[in-house]
UniProtKB/Swiss-Prot annotation:
Residue positions, PTM N5-methylglutamine: Q151
InterPro entries, per the entry: Ribosomal_uL3, Ribosomal_uL3_bac/org-type, Ribosomal_uL3_CS, Transl_B-barrel_sf
Species the sequence originates in: Rickettsia felis (strain ATCC VR-1525 / URRWXCal2) (Rickettsia azadi)
Gene Ontology CC terms: ribonucleoprotein complex; ribosome
Subunit structure: Part of the 50S ribosomal subunit. Forms a cluster with proteins L14 and L19.
Single GO MF annotation: structural constituent of ribosome
Domain of life: Bacteria
GO biological process terms, semicolon-separated: translation
The protein's name: Large ribosomal subunit protein uL3
PANTHER family for this protein: 50S RIBOSOMAL PROTEIN L3, LARGE RIBOSOMAL SUBUNIT PROTEIN UL3C
Length: 215
C-alpha cells in the first residue's frame, strides 16, 4: 500500500475526447509536497508517512512544529496529513512527491471536506418531500413532521433526520479516473467532480476497490 499525496483543488473545466464526448474535469495542484516524517510499527504501532504541502511563513509556525520541520530539514508546510503504508513503501524524509507519482488512466480515491451550507432544513438537507400544500396544512409546508412515537419510548432517537448544520463533512469519493497529468503546471486532471471549495486541500490515494489501468 503506497502513500497518498496532498493536493489543492483549483477548479473545474471540460474537454472533448476523440469521440466528441464532453468530459468534466477537476484540476488539482500538487505544489511543494514533501515527506515530513515517519511513523513506524516499533515506535508508534503502525507504519505511516507524514506528508506536508505548500511552504508556510516561519513566523506563523509554533515552536514545537518548528523543531519538527528542522529535524526533517525542510521548510515549514501549511497542511500536514498522515498516510498509512506497508513496510516496503517507506520514502526518505524530505523527498518530494510530484504529480507524476500518479499516471493517466489510474483510478484514485479522493478525501476532502464538503462545502459548508450552514443551518439547513430537512428538505434541503435530507431531500424530504415536505408536507401538503393545502388540505389543512398551515405554515408547516416545509416541515419534517413528527419526530417521535408515543409515551414509549418517549424520546427522539439519535440519528433522526432533522434540520441542522449541513456540509463541512469529510467525505471520500472512490474510483475517480485520472484523465491526464501536466508535470509542467503541476496539475492532475481528474474526471468528475470533487468535494470542497476552490483552493481547499484534499488527499489523493490509489483506489482500494478497483484495479488501476494506464491508457
Amino acid at each position: 500500500m503506497r502513500t497518498g499525496i496532498i493536493a489543492q483543488k483549483i477548479g473545474m473545466t471540460s474537454v472533448f475526447n476523440d469521440k466528441g464526448e464532453r468530459i468534466s474535469l477537476t484540476l488539482v495542484k500538487v505544489d511543494d509536497c514533501q515527506v515530513v516524517g515517519h511513523k513506524t510499527l516499533e515506535k508508534h504501532g503502525y507504519n505511516a508517512l507524514v506528508i506536508g504541502i505548500k511552504d508556510k511563513k516561519i513566523s506563523r509556525v509554533t515552536k514545537p512544529m518548528k523543531q519538527v520541520f528542522a529535524n526533517a530539514k525542510i521548510s515549514p508546510k501549511t497542511k500536514l496529513k498522515e498516510f498509512r503504508i506497508s513496510e516496503e513503501n517507506f520514502i526518505d524524509i524530505a523527498a518530494s512527491l510530484e504529480v507524476d507519482y500518479f499516471t493517466a488512466g489510474q483510478f484514485v480515491d479522493i478525501t476532502a471536506t464538503t462545502i459548508g451550507k450552514g443551518f439547513a432544513g430537512s428538505m434541503k438537507r435530507h431531500n424530504f418531500r415536505g408536507l401538503e400544500a393545502s388540505h389543512g396544512v398551515s405554515i408547516s409546508h416545509r416541515s419534517h413532521g413528527s419526530t417521535g412515537q408515543r409515551q414509549d419510548p418517549g424520546k427522539v432517537f439519535k440519528g433522526k433526520k432533522m434540520a441542522g448544520h449541513m456540509g463541512c463533512n469529510q467525505v471520500t469519493i472512490q474510483n475517480l479516473k485520472i484523465f491526464a497529468v501536466d508535470k509542467e503546471r503541476k496539475l492532475i486532471m481528474i474526471q468528475g467532480s470533487i468535494p470542497g471549495h476552490k483552493n481547499s486541500y484534499l488527499s489523493v490515494k490509489d483506489a482500494i476497490k478497483k484495479i488501476s489501468i494506464t491508457v
